[in-house]
C-alpha cells in the first residue's frame, strides 16, 4: 500500500526511465530533417565516420543520436519503414544491459536494427539470438538490405553449416543465430585442437529475441556435447518389463503411514521414488533375471547403476507421456519443448531417461552418452560483455532477470493504445464440459466471421480438441510439434475470416497474425506477379480485413491456464496488435493439470460442490484469486529451481572458465616448454616426497619404492640405492636435485634427437589431449556428486557447501593427475637416431611398393604420408601409448598417424 502511494507521487522507476529517454528521442527527431537531405552516398559514409570517431576516443553513447537518425533514414529509404518514437526508446533501452518489454506487433525486429548497428560499429561482432532457425533466417533476410546499405555485413549461423561458412558467419558484423547453436559452438570451440578450428570471436554484444523463453524457460536446460559410453541396451529392455508389475501409492511411507504400493510420484518435480516394499519386489525380480545375486541389494555399490536404470524406467512410464512430453516419429523418440510446443530434433534427455522411453515405446535404443562438455544458457549468456533482450512479456519476471543476469526490465509504451477485451475466466467441472463450451464459443465467433486462435498446453490436448472440432464439422488448422513444417503457412492464414487455428502453447510465436490473412504470403506463391495480380490480392485482403475488423478482430481462447502468467499473457498478446480490436478468454476445468497439482484435494472438492448442474460455468473474482495463487506457487517453485541450479552450476562454471582459459592459452601458444619444466619440477618433487619425506631420517626412506615408481612411471633406471651406499653423506636435498636434473638431461637429449619443433608440438598435443580426457571424466564425477549431494542434508550438513568443498577437492586432484600424466608420457617416449629412421623409411618404402598393386592411396592420404615421411626424426611406439597424441602436431592419436601399422618397424 505504501509503495503504491510513493509510486503515485514520484512515479515508478519505469516512468522515470521513459521520461529520460523521451528527451533523447526529441534530439533524434531534430536530426531527421538534416539527414533526409543527405544523398545515399553521404548517408552511407556515416558508418566510416562513426568508426573513425570511436577510434579517436568517442563513446557509443555520444554517437547514439546520430547513429539512430542514420538507421531511421536508411530504413525509410531501403525498406520503406520509418522507426516510431517508441521504437527509438526500445532501441536505446537495448543498447545497454536491459530488457525491453514490447507488446506483440510493435515491431521488435525493426527496433533491433538500432542497437545492432550502434554496437556493430565497435567491430567486435553482434549476435542476434532467436529461438529457431526459421526466425534467424527470416529476421536476417528482412534486415539485410538495411545493414548492407550502411556497409555492415550480415550472416546467419544455424546448425549444419560447413566449418568455413560458420567461421565467416561469426566474422560478420551482425550474426543471426539460435541460442542453442551459439552455446554449442562455444563448447565446440573449447574442444578444438588448433586455434584455426575455432569459430567464435570475443563474446561482445548479444541481443536476445523472446528473451523470456531463452533465459527463463530454457534456463535449466544444459547444453551438452556427449561421447559414446558403454552399451546398456539389454539392461534397459529387461528393466522395462518390470515396471508394469509395480503398483502406485498416493504418498510416501512414514512413521505414521505405511502404504501397500511399490512407488510414489512427485508430479511437481517429475520424480519417482520406490517404497521399501517396491525395493524388495524389484530386487526379487532382478535376481530372477540374473541381473543381481541372491542377497544383494540395490544400494550395494556395484548395483547402484541398476537402481539408476529402474528409476529412469519408472519415470519414463509414469511421468512422461507420448504426445505431451515427446512424440514418436520415424522410429525415434523426439522431445517436445514444454515451453514452445515445438519438437527438438537431436536433443536427448540425460541420465538414461531417453533410453528408458525408447525401451517403453519399443523403438531402437540409442547408446548412452558421456558428457564431454556442457554449459547452461544462464552461464553462457553471462559471458557476453553486453547482454540485452526483448520480448512481449518480461515484467512478471523482472525480479529474476535482475537477480540472475543483472538486467533491468523497461516496459515500452505501445505506439497505439491496446483495446483488446480480456474477458473473465470460465471454470467448468470437467474437461468434457469445458471442451463443449469451447466448441460453442468457436461456433459463435464463426457465425460473425471472427477468426479464432485456440491455445493448448500439449500436443495431446490439441489433438483431442481437433477431434472434437472435426466431429462438430468445424474446419480448422492444427499448429503443434507434429505439424512444425507447415508453421509459417498456418500462421499466415490464422487471421482470415472464420479461420480456426489450434496452437500448442505458443507454437508460431515470433510470427505476427495479420488480420484478414497475410497477403504477402499469397504474393510469395506467385512467380513474377503482374501489377494487376498484386492489386487483386491486396483488394481481396482489404475486403477480408474489413470483415474481421467488424467481427471484433482476432479472438483468443485459452484451453487451460499455464504454470506461468507470462505464458498466458503471451497467448493473449497474439491479439490486439498495433491498436487492432481483439478479445480473449480462458476456459478452465477442475481436471486441468495446474488445478490437480497445485490445489489440495480439499479445495478441489469444495469447488466441485459449487457446481449444481452439468455444463454450468463458474466465473468470479474468488476463482481468479485461486488461479493466481496457484500460478504464484508454480512461479516461485520454478524460480527457486532455476536459482538452485545456478548456485550449483556456478561452482562448475568457475572450474569450466579456468579450464577453458588454460585451453585457449595452449592453443594460442606455440612454445609451452617453460610450463612443462615447471610442471616437471612439481611432479618429481611430489613423487620424491612420497618416498623420501622432507626433513626425515634415512630409516624412513623407501628407496626401492622410489626406484620402482621412477622406472614404471617415468622410464628412468636410477641406481639410487647404490648412490646411497657409495656416498654415505648424500643429503636428501642433494638426492632430490640429482634426480630432477637427470630427468631434465634425459628429456633434453631426446629433444636434441627429435628437434625442438617436433617436441614443442608433442608437448602441446599431450597437454591438450590429457586435459580434455580428464575434464570429461571430471564432468561425469561432478554429475554423480551433484545427484547424491542432497543426502548430506540428512546429516545436518548444507548440501551446497559440501558440493563446493568436494568439487574443489576433485578439481585440485584432477589438476594434479593432469600434471602427473603429462610428465609421465613425456618422460617415457623414446626417440631414434637419424640413421635408424632412414633405415626404417627404406624398409617402409619397399613394403609400400610391394603393396601398391593392391592399394590405391587417396590424394589426401598421399599428402599426409609425404608430410610424415618428411619429419626430421621419428618417435617409436615402445614407450608411448597408442592413444597418445602424435608428436608431428597433426592432432591425431599416435595409432592413427606415425603409430599406424605401416610405421611399426
Swiss-Prot record:
Pfam families: P-loop_SecA (PF21090), SEC-C (PF02810), SecA_DEAD (PF07517), SecA_PP_bind (PF01043), SecA_SW (PF07516). It is found in: Cell inner membrane; Cytoplasm. It is a peripheral membrane protein. Its cofactor is Zn(2+). Keywords: ATP-binding, Cell inner membrane, Cell membrane, Cytoplasm, Membrane, Metal-binding, Nucleotide-binding, Protein transport, Translocase, Translocation, Transport, Zinc. It catalyses: ATP + H2O + cellular proteinSide 1 = ADP + phosphate + cellular proteinSide 2. ATP binds at residues 87, 105-109, 512. GO terms for cellular component: cell envelope Sec protein transport complex; cytosol; plasma membrane. GO terms for biological process: intracellular protein transmembrane transport; protein import; protein targeting; protein transport by the Sec complex. GO terms for molecular function: ATP binding; metal ion binding; protein-exporting ATPase activity. Zn(2+) binds at residues 886, 888, 897-898. CDD domains: DEXDc_SecA, SF2_C_secA. Belongs to the SecA family. Monomer and homodimer. Part of the essential Sec protein translocation apparatus which comprises SecA, SecYEG and auxiliary proteins SecDF-YajC and YidC. This is Protein translocase subunit SecA. The lineage of its organism: Bacteria, Pseudomonadati, Pseudomonadota, Gammaproteobacteria, Pasteurellales. The gene is secA.
Amino acid at each position: 500500500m505504501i509503495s503504491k502511494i510513493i509510486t503515485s507521487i514520484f512515479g515508478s522507476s519505469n516512468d522515470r526511465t521513459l521520461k529520460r529517454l523521451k528527451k533523447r528521442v526529441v534530439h533524434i527527431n531534430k536530426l531527421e530533417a538534416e539527414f533526409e537531405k543527405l544523398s545515399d552516398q553521404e548517408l552511407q559514409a556515416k558508418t566510416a565516420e562513426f568508426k573513425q570517431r570511436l577510434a579517436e576516443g568517442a563513446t557509443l553513447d555520444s554517437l547514439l543520436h546520430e547513429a539512430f537518425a542514420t538507421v531511421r533514414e536508411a530504413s525509410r529509404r531501403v525498406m520503406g519503414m520509418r522507426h516510431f518514437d517508441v521504437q527509438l526508446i526500445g532501441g536505446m533501452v537495448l543498447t545497454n544491459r536491459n530488457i525491453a518489454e514490447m507488446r506483440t506487433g510493435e515491431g521488435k525486429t525493426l527496433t533491433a536494427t538500432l542497437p545492432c548497428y550502434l554496437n556493430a560499429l565497435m567491430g567486435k561482432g553482434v549476435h542476434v539470438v532467436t529461438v529457431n532457425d526459421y526466425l534467424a533466417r527470416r529476421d536476417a533476410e528482412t534486415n539485410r538490405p538495411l545493414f548492407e546499405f550502411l556497409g555492415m555485413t550480415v550472416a546467419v549461423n544455424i546448425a549444419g553449416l560447413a566449418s568455413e561458412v560458420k567461421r565467416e558467419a561469426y566474422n560478420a558484423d551482425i550474426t543471426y543465430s539460435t541460442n542453442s547453436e551459439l552455446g554449442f559452438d562455444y563448447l565446440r570451440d573449447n574442444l578444438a585442437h588448433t586455434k584455426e578450428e575455432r569459430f567464435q570471436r570475443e563474446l561482445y554484444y548479444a541481443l536476445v529475441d523472446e528473451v523470456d523463453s531463452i533465459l527463463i524457460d530454457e534456463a535449466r536446460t544444459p547444453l551438452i556435447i556427449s561421447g559414446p559410453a558403454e552399451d546398456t541396451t539389454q539392461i534397459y529392455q529387461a528393466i522395462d518389463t518390470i515396471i508394469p508389475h509395480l503398483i502406485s501409492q498416493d504418498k510416501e511411507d512414514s512413521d505414521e503411514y505405511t502404504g501397500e504400493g511399490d512407488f510414489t510420484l512427485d508430479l511437481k518435480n517429475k520424480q519417482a521414488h520406490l517404497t521399501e516394499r517396491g525395493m524388495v519386489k524389484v530386487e526379487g525380480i532382478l535376481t530372477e533375471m540374473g541381473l543381481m545375486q541372491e542377497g544383494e541389494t540395490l544400494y550395494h555399490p556395484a548395483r547402484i547403476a541398476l537402481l539408476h536404470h529402474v528409476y529412469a524406467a519408472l519415470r519414463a512410464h509414469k511421468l512422461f507421456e507420448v504426445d505431451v512430453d515427446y512424440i514418436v516419429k520415424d522410429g525415434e523418440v523426439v522431445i517436445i519443448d514444454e515451453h514452445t510446443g515445438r519438437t527438438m530434433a537431436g536433443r536427448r534427455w540425460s541420465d538414461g531417461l531417453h533410453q528408458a522411453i525408447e525401451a517403453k515405446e519399443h523403438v531402437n535404443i540409442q547408446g548412452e552418452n558421456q558428457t564431454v562438455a556442457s554449459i547452461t544458457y544462464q552461464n553462457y549468456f553471462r559471458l557476453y560483455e553486453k547482454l540485452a533482450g526483448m520480448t512481449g512479456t518480461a515484467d512478471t519476471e523482472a525480479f529474476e532477470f535482475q537477480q540472475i543476469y543483472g538486467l533491468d526490465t523497461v516496459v515500452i509504451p505501445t505506439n497505439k493504445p491496446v483495446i483488446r477485451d480480456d474477458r473473465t475466466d470460465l471454470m467448468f467441472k470437467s474437461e468434457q464440459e469445458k471442451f463443449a463450451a469451447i466448441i460453442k464459443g468457436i461456433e459463435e465467433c464463426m457465425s460473425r466471421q471472427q477468426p479464432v486462435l485456440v491455445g493448448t498446453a500439449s500436443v495431446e490436448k490439441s489433438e483431442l480438441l481437433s477431434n472434437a472440432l472435426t466431429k462438430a464439422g468445424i474446419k480448422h488448422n492444427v499448429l503443434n510439434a507434429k505439424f512444425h513444417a507447415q508453421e509459417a503457412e498456418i500462421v499466415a492464414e490464422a487471421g482470415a475470416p472464420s479461420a480456426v487455428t489450434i496452437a500448442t502453447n505458443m507454437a508460431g510465436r515470433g510470427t505476427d497474425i495479420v488480420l484478414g490473412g497475410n497477403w504477402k504470403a499469397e504474393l510469395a506463391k506467385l512467380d513474377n506477379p503482374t501489377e494487376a495480380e498484386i492489386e487483386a490480392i491486396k483488394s481481396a485482403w482489404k475486403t477480408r480485413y474489413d470483415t474481421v475488423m467488424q467481427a471484433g478482430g482476432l479472438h483468443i481462447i485459452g484451453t487451460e491456464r499455464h504454470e506461468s502468467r507470462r505464458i498466458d499473457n503471451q497467448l493473449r498478446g497474439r491479439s490486439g496488435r498495433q491498436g487492432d480490436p481483439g478479445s480473449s478468454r480462458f476456459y478452465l476445468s477442475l481436471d486441468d493439470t495446474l488445478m490437480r497439482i497445485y490445489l489440495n484435494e480439499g479445495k478441489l472438492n469444495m469447488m466441485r460442490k459449487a457446481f449444481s448442474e452439468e455444463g454450468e460455468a463458474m466465473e468470479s473474482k474468488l476463482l481468479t484469486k485461486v488461479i493466481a495463487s496457484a500460478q504464484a506457487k508454480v512461479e516461485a517453485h520454478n524460480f527457486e529451481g532455476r536459482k538452485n541450479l545456478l548456485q550449483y552450476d556456478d561452482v562448475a562454471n568457475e572450474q569450466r572458465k579456468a579450464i577453458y582459459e588454460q585451453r585457449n592459452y595452449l592453443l594460442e601458444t606455440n612454445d609451452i616448454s617453460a610450463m612443462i619444466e615447471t610442471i616437471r619440477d612439481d611432479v618429481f618433487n611430489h613423487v620424491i616426497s612420497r618416498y623420501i619425506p622432507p626433513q626425515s631420517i634415512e630409516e624412513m626412506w623407501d628407496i626401492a619404492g622410489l626406484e620402482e615408481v621412477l622406472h614404471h612411471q617415468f622410464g628412468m633406471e636410477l641406481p639410487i640405492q647404490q648412490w646411497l651406499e657409495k656416498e654415505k653423506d648424500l643429503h636428501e636435498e642433494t638426492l632430490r636435485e640429482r634426480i630432477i636434473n637427470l630427468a631434465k638431461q634425459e628429456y633434453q637429449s631426446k629433444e636434441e634427437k627429435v628437434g625442438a619443433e617436433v617436441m614443442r608440438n608433442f608437448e602441446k598435443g599431450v597437454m591438450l589431449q590429457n586435459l580434455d580426457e580428464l575434464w570429461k571424466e571430471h564432468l561425469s564425477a561432478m554429475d554423480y556428486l551433484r545427484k547424491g549431494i542432497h543426502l548430506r542434508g540428512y546429516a545436518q550438513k548444507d548440501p551446497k557447501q559440501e558440493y563446493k568443498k568436494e568439487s574443489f577437492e576433485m578439481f585440485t586432484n584432477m589438476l594434479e593427475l593432469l600434471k602427473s600424466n603429462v610428465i609421465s608420457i613425456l618422460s617415457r617416449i623414446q626417440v631414434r637416431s637419424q640413421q635408424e629412421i632412414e633405415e626404417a623409411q627404406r624398409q617402409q618404402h619397399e613394403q609400400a611398393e610391394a603393396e601398391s598393386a593392391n592399394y590405391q592411396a587417396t590424394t589426401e592420404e598421399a599428402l599426409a604420408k609425404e608430410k610424415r615421411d618428411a619429419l626430421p626424426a621419428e618417435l617409436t611406439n615402445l614407450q608411448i601409448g597408442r592413444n597418445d597424441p602424435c608428436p608431428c602436431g597433426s592432432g591425431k592419436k599416435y595409432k592413427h598417424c606415425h603409430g599406424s601399422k605401416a610405421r611399426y618397424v
